[in-house]
Design a protein with these regions (language model features):
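Bacterial N-terminal signal peptides
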Residues: 9-19
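Hydrophobic face of amphipathic alpha-helices that form TPR/SEL1-like repeat modules
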Residues: 41, 70-77, 81, 106-113, ...
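N-terminal leader/linker segments that initiate helical-solenoid repeat arrays
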Residues: 21-76, 317-323
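Structural signature of tandem alpha-helical TPR/SEL1-like repeats
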Residues: 45-54, 82-91, 118-130, 154-166, ...
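TPR/TPR-like alpha-solenoid repeats
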Residues: 74, 95, 110, 131, ...
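Terminal, low-structured helical/coil segments at or just beyond the last alpha-helical repeat
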Residues: 281-323
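TPR/TPR-like alpha-solenoid signature
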Residues: 69, 105, 126, 141, ...
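Short helix-capping/linker turns of helical repeat alpha-solenoids
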Residues: 61-64, 77-79, 84, 97-100, ...
């Protein structure tokens, strides 16, 4: 699927890693990340039983909104000739018009990204509000992103904060992460590191990789929580295990420096290489430094480990389609 500034599921709010002179240390002012339009979540891992495709197709064609939404997801995630943004848009539209809130959010994602249709932020906002009126937490989160980023609406941090707060209190881990981000930076509210850390913790405990990454960063810097390299390392590990490249880079730095763990240049090289293989080059300076300290055999071993990590990545949602 083509992507744009919203569609990756993760918006890097600013440069993640600020290296000190010579690349020797992690910056104490490392910024955080925020979740973008679609909630970061695992794809197709729900409590919904797997049904026969012909049955789903028949029920969708008969007007069942749940199955229409599932076929929309299947169409947009398909590989090869079965991939069809237009077909996904059609299924989401049918389910959304029947009042199915997850499909309304998914249709908004399609409109906001211009997938299967010209981009239309007004239509995206319309469907998000329809889902929000039904109390669907992901809609609150996505409306917050609209106002935070100023897409189709006037940029308004206070309004974004209000939507994130509603979503966070409804249990949406993306909204919890972003509410923490707002408190962390003082956007739409007074800056409050302790409250930021509390919301990051809720999101992290729910398994949100950005929440895990941002909480790790709080522990690394001792903001809102006591400084604790071991806790930072542990949370970076959890986010890295979910494929979060920024966490992988920071994990590499911690292994390289022996912070929160035993010093392990080979592991550092593996994690940063895994991030680079995923398209994130921000650990390049440390990677270059480590290359000079590892033997050819060690580098080959580390690269093999990085390739294994990359192949075994859990599939993170690039679009956060609601099910």
């Amino acid at each position: 699927m083509k992507t744009n500034s919203w569609g990756t599921g993760i918006l890097v709010a600013m440069v993640l890693l600020v290296e000190s002179a010579g690349g020797e240390g992690l910056s104490p002012t490392t910024p955080k990340e925020q979740c973008s339009l679609a909630v970061v979540s695992r794809l197709l891992q729900t409590d919904i039983p797997v049904c026969d495709g012909a049955v789903v197709q028949r029920m969708a064609s008969s007007g069942h909104a749940f199955e229409q939404n599932q076929l929309g997801i299947a169409s947009v995630l398909a590989v090869g000739p079965d991939y069809s943004e237009k077909e996904a848009l059609d299924w989401f539209t049918q389910a959304a018009q029947r009042g199915y809130a997850p499909a309304q959010v998914n249709l908004a994602v399609m409109y906001s990204n211009g997938w299967g249709t010209p981009a239309n932020y007004g239509a995206a906002q319309h469907w998000l509000r329809a889902a929000a009126e039904q109390g669907f937490a992901r809609a609150y989160f996505n409306l917050g992103v609209l106002y935070l980023e100023g897409h189709g609406v006037r940029r308004d941090s206070a309004e974004a904060f209000r939507w994130f707060q509603t979503g966070a209190e409804s249990g949406d881990s993306g909204a919890q992460t972003n509410l923490g981000y707002m408190y962390d930076l003082g956007l739409g509210c007074a800056k409050n590191p302790a409250t930021a850390a509390a919301w990051y913790t809720k999101a992290a405990l729910a398994g949100n990789p950005l929440g895990e990454n941002n909480l790790a960063d709080m522990y690394l810097r001792g903001e809102g929580v006591p400084q604790d390299d071991s806790a930072a390392f542990s949370w970076f590990q959890k986010a890295a295990a979910q494929g979060h490249t920024g966490a992988r880079i920071k994990l590499g730095y911690m292994y390289a420096q022996g912070r929160g763990t035993a010093k392990d240049p080979l592991a550092a090289y593996s994690w940063i290489t895994a991030a680079a293989l995923a398209g994130d080059p921000r650990g390049g300076d440390l990677l270059y430094s480590l290359e000079r300290s590892l033997s050819a055999e060690q580098k080959a071993q580390a690269k093999q480990q990085a390739s294994t990590l990359r192949r075994s990545d859990p599939q993170l949602s690039a679009t956060g389609f609601a099910q």
